[in-house]
Amino acid sequence: MQSMPLLLRQSFKSTLNLTRTTRPVQRRPLLPAVGPNSLYPAPRNFSICLQCQFRTQSSLYSSDSLKDGKPAEQPKEDASPVIALPAGNANLEADAGSQQQAPPAAAEAGESTQSQQQQQQQQQQQEEKSEANGKGWGDGGLPSYIEQRRSQFTKRFSDVMDNLQSNIFVAGQRLNDLTGYSAIEMLKKEIHRQEERLRTARLQVRTAKDAYAAAINNRSTSQREVNELLQRKHAWSPTDLERFTHLYRNDHTNEVAEHEAQEALSQAEHEAEEAAAQLSKSILSRYHEEQVWSDKIRQMSTWGTWGLMGVNVLLFLIFQIAVEPWRRKRLVKGFEEKVIEAIEKEKALDRIQIVTAQNQMAQESSTTSTASTATPETAETAETAEPSASPADEPIADTDAIVTIESTEPEVFSSDPADAEPPANTIVSKPTPDNIREYIKFQLARVSPLLESLRQYLHDLFSDRQVVLTQRDLSTVALQSAAAGAAVIGMLSMIIRQR
């Protein structure tokens, strides 16, 4: 550290030698503070005051913190000021050890501090923006941003809901125009106007009555005073004479005012009567139009009700005549097909069982024939023992032989009884009366279930079978019957009217 007298001496010498400097002061150009890597390396001046040099060039020693992304610390406020000395004074350099480039270093330090402050401000703004977005009131929470993110369908739906009241009003106005209620609305407005007119006319009548009464009172008062003056005519004073003259002159004016008030009263009464008559006429016209409109709406509703009832009856008849039989026929047909399929399966199974039984009998007969050949002696003794054997046994032997011959042919049976083919001996090549009779019976068997089901349905409709119904079902049946009867009667009445 330099001593206080040395600093004073340096400052004094600098003030004396400022005028003798012939060398221009050369300063290093200032560079933008983009970071510690872009700055020039600070030259090492005379190491008289390294602490001051460190304070002035503090930005060069904060590269680690800038690399880590943290803002560099600002220089302390209690740092000692840098003494700027001229570069051309050789005596000052010899005495105190120069700091020739102190002003450029100070400028660079100022630029670095400004850049650090700007970086801090930018980081603070980014943090505030991120916090605002996180909380929901930043750019993502603004109404304009939310409005942009809305879909087209949502916007259209909101517009429709906003204009719902106006649309309903317009629809009601159109409906009134179609039904003729707009004229009734105009009559209502006219009635309100007539009521206001009648109210004003009555107020005018009241005012005219008050004015007429005031005019009558004024004239009667003046006439009374004139009569009093005439009674004491012999004792008139000049004042009484002037008063009598004034009253006599004003009597004509009072008479004219009375007549005018009377005419105004009669005119106001006439106008009030006319307004009342017009109002009553408008009210009667409105009631008449409303009655006509209500009759028209009632007639339209009646025809609409009849139309709906006719549509319901028509649908009922269509379902009962066309749909229900078709559905029932379809169900019966499906049931018949299933029954026929089951019968065919049973027949195939019976045939397979018969064939298997015949095979078993053939096998048993073959075993018995082998046993008979093995013991011929026993057979001969049996023949001698029974010489008078019946010739009916020979066809049995022949059939056994035939069965054995048929059993020698291999037969393959399918695992599915429905797909199993009938044996060859059951196939008939020529139609016989028995086969025709069976075919006819089979066709009649297919038709008979349908007829039987229809017969049972009709018998069930008119049978004495007890049925438990709920009140709802009973009411539905009654309403349907009433609707059908009303529809039939309405159709008959329309036909009769047309004729």
Swiss-Prot record:
It comes from Aspergillus niger (strain ATCC MYA-4892 / CBS 513.88 / FGSC A1513). One of its GO terms (biological process) is inner mitochondrial membrane organization. Residues 181-283 form a coiled coil. PANTHER family: SENSITIVE TO HIGH EXPRESSION PROTEIN 9, MITOCHONDRIAL. GO terms for cellular component: mitochondrial inner membrane. Keywords: Coiled coil, Membrane, Mitochondrion, Mitochondrion inner membrane, Transit peptide, Transmembrane, Transmembrane helix. Residues 94-144, 360-396, 410-431 are annotated as: Disordered. Pfam families: She9_MDM33. Required for the maintenance of the structure of the mitochondrial inner membrane. Involved in mitochondrial morphology. Causes growth arrest when highly overexpressed. It is found in: Mitochondrion inner membrane. The chain crosses the membrane at residues 303-323, 476-496. It comes from the Eukaryota. This is Sensitive to high expression protein 9 homolog, mitochondrial. InterPro entries: MDM33_fungi. Residues 324-475 are mitochondrial intermembrane. It is a multi-pass membrane protein. Residues 497-499 are mitochondrial matrix. Belongs to the SHE9 family. Homooligomer. Residues 96-125, 364-392 have a biased composition (Low complexity).
